[in-house]
From Swiss-Prot:
InterPro entries: DNA-dir_RNA_pol_bsu_ext_1_sf (IPR042107), DNA-dir_RNA_pol_su2 (IPR015712), DNA-dir_RNAP_su2_dom (IPR007120), DNA-dir_RNAP_su2_hyb_sf (IPR037033), RNA_pol_bsu_bac (IPR010243), RNA_pol_bsu_CS (IPR007121), RNA_pol_bsu_protrusion (IPR007644), RNA_pol_Rpb2_2 (IPR007642). DNA-dependent RNA polymerase catalyzes the transcription of DNA into RNA using the four ribonucleoside triphosphates as substrates. One of its GO terms (molecular function) is DNA-directed RNA polymerase activity. NCBIfam families: PRK00405.1 (NF001616). It comes from the Eukaryota. GO terms for biological process: DNA-templated transcription. It holds the Pfam family RNA_pol_Rpb2_6. This is DNA-directed RNA polymerase subunit beta. GO terms for cellular component: chloroplast; DNA-directed RNA polymerase complex; mitochondrion. Belongs to the RNA polymerase beta chain family. Keywords: Chloroplast, DNA-directed RNA polymerase, Nucleotidyltransferase, Plastid, Transcription, Transferase. In plastids the minimal PEP RNA polymerase catalytic core is composed of four subunits: alpha, beta, beta', and beta''. When a (nuclear-encoded) sigma factor is associated with the core the holoenzyme is formed, which can initiate transcription. Its main location: plastid.
Amino acid sequence: MEMNMFILPDFLQIQIESFRRFLHNCIFEELSKFPIIYDSNQGIEFKLIPEKYLLTEPLFTEREAVYKFTTYSSDLYVPIQLTLTKEKKSRIQTVCLGSLPLMTPQGTFVINGVSWTIVNQILRNPGIYYVLNRNGMYTATILCLDVDKRLRLEIDKKGRLSVRINNRHKIPLVFLLIALGLDINDIPDWLQSRTKKLEDLLSGLKNEGERTLELIALYKQLPGPKKVKPKANPLIISEQIQQWCAQVYKLGTSGRLNLNRRLNLNFSKSNDSLLPQDLIAAAELLVKMSLLHPGPKGGKDSSDDIDHLKNKHVISVAEMLRKQLSLCLIDLQIQVRRAIRRGISSKRILSPRSMMISRPLTQMFNQFFGSHELIQFLDQTNPLAEMAHKRKLSLLGPGGLTRRTASFRTRDIHPSHYGRICTIETSEGMNAGVIPSLSICARVDSEGVIENPLHKIGGNIKEQYTVYVRAGRDERLKIGTNNCLAIGQKGQERSTSTQYQQEFVSMSWDQINLRSILPIQYFAIGASLIPFLEHNDATRTLMGSSMQRQAVPLVKPEKSIVGTGIEAHISLDSGTVLISLKDGKIKYVDGKQIVLVDKDNVQQKFNLITYERSNNGTCIHQRPTVKIGFSVRKGQLLADGSATVGGELALGKNVLVAYMPWEGYNFEDAVLISDRLVNEDIYTSIHIQRYEISVQENIEGFDIITREIPHVDKYLLRHLDYRGIIKIGAWVEPGDVLVGKLAPLEAPHLLRSPEGKLLQAIFGVQAITTRESCLKLPAGGTGRVIDVRWIEQQGPSGVSSLHVYILQKRKIQVGDKVAGRHGNKGVVSRILPREDMPYMQDGTPIDMVLSPLGVPSRMNVGQLFECLLGLAGSYLNNHYRIMPFDERFEREASRKLVFSELYKARKFTGYPWLFEPNSPGKSSLFDGRTGEIFEQSITVGKAYMMKLIHMVDEKIHARSSGPYALVTQQPLRGRSNKGGQRVGEMEVWAFEGFGAAYMLQEILTIKSDHVKGRSQVRGAIVAKESIPKPIDPPDCFRLLIRELRCLGIEIKHTIISEKNFFLDQKPI
């Protein structure tokens, strides 16, 4: 594809275009494949009319589906023709096959009120691949459309050929060819000579009885359920083997083209099954490769690079949904055949609608969205996290790799990834390298091939245009990487870095065919947001891109002074901002809607999203940016999102930072901050928590929602209305009742007996038939109630639920995690009064003190360029959008730009300390406590720092008493289990070093797993007595003894002397 001008593609194109292709093409193609079902005995014919299928409009919008906890879907209607051939009657009815989940304009699926996304999968193309194994021998692997089905041709050291089915069963290749129906005389002589014990095999095959047994043995080795008789005809068995191979070993169009190209064959695209001629040609090439390149060091040029992107394709949303639709239609065939048999036996009049007992489409897609491992809970921490999640790729999943089997070679960067898959952004840990991201300019075509845009270089301007190039087609082209100048400083033409044949070489500019369009086109959107990216280590850049996705939207967002220029494009494609769809004038604006009137006096209303909870508990909110009477053009910004300012992405704040030590409070990446960040809500964020309680019917009766809750303090019920539900707008604290609920309880047996009823009548005792099961606010949930929703579940269960939404404003505090865009992260260690913070020469106090030791060892110098340029921009009131790799224009371009802007700020403000020639970028600071000047000059600047979602409110935890493990009788661990902190080996050493013997004894025994000791200590504390010493061993010692007994080792003790020795001898 050629284009004269290049613009950044829609970042959601990989999701939306794929789903559009599914709606417009895949549904019709799958419905067209549905066979005509014909019952010859009764003369009934059943067929679909795919040309007239319909998709209804959804009952709810995507926002209503989220609010009502339902699925955003559309019903699929297909006309069905039922013909009675004997009676010559035909009837056509439009039948609903079920509900099809729809994709929202933001590229997500709303299932039961929750946003989900489908991660695109990378799989190897079907075809044949020759690989050199560890023994120095070539193998040929034939992959089919179903990746689990494969054939492997092997050749041993003696040159004998065999085939291995699904990596398990190994048989001679000649025998498989004969079983597939090939005559012995049609097998080439060279292949017969490379078969082990060929004469015995041929003699056995000539004998009909032995041939039948051999075929049966082969047929049983094939995967899948099979039934065969011992005395079956060998021709029938051979036909069954051929049918099995035709069904299982489907190559598809791409697989057939791959085989034709690699083996020099000429079969039609429609012939997509594996043929005996394919196996013969594959074996012939395998023999030639083994003869030409023998030994473990030979043949690397002839083998296929299985990690090259030309041998892989992307399984997108369309292919996954298409597979589910095909499975649904298979179930429909079975259902129709059963309905025909059932209708014939019961002598009922059949109709298309009566034959559709269930909706197979709904069941199949519910199962798919509920269990598939590539359907993931959408990360909605901020717009960047949402966008990056939709552009992820996965090598895992059905037919793919696993975390444990993925090799280092598979995880590593391949030369074909450049410009297509980001070389930096990937998951950390076990998923490193197997969960990459799509590059910022790359796109996926309808065949699942990743394409990279390049600019063609010609003699004149008309011959220069942009083309999208597939992987593999660019290997013979010379591609300039666009990261350095073609002309040196002295005017001579110099060589430039060029990508050629999977290598980076230096060439002169006149030899280059294509060049890259943008310096950042090799990276994903997260890494592309990092300014001065080229000055950072790749590991820190990876951390910076991942931590940007963890930044929480702030109450007062602020766009960065220093950026890269794609912030507006990300916020626009994420759908968080509101854009005008036509020219017009603003007639009305408030916090919930905007009314626009166009030139034809037609009103258009835009409903704003207000305080909506995301999947991660952050706040989704839109703020109007226009006023009444404003004239707007089509495409102009009407409202900002929760993490955008002026249509640009704004994840953090520009704060004044200093790189210096301060009394050890910024040791090991700790961060010292000013109380100004707390008092002025600089880093205050809004979080919305959802608490729910179910209301259902059980054996004893219905649950009751009421305000009259016995034995509960009335103060805790103060915010409930007359129904027993919390009032909207109430300020609630931990322990408050949100929903008053009484669950039915079966009366005790004694009270239901005649004696019990007599006692109730005499003494007036009422039987307790309910128990309190209220929804109470847990610890750390203080906030304001903003919404209460009653959700009624459809279906036979009849379980309804109440959802209470509580909004919290969280200020930054000690223990919260903050980070920059360059992988510089830290935890707030102390909040100082602003008068105690170091201050600049103009009296401005520092907002944040960072450790200077975090820069040289991490090699992320980009943060220094950013903070110095930000300081100059704050005084000049400028914002900078700098594309990375600016050294392609001039040597030391970044340093020169920063110093020149600092010099401009010095001249503009008259502050000479902003740029001192002896120590550029540094200035003297004063100690806020003493007023004395620090001895050394200190780097000071405006850095863009973000507050991450790892907040101390959700992590801090303490345990007084709690649950214990059943086997070891030791306390559980984790905040969710109300667990304790483990005292490990090194902690025991610390206690021993301080001589805390009694504390150590308590921790290891009565506070841990000494069951009797726990109860004795509790009784002693209640009785105010001294804590007794434990006599019995703890349960961990008993567990050790039992485990040793399982190994056949018995532990006993022997009393050496009984003098003054008392021992209670009990079995352990």
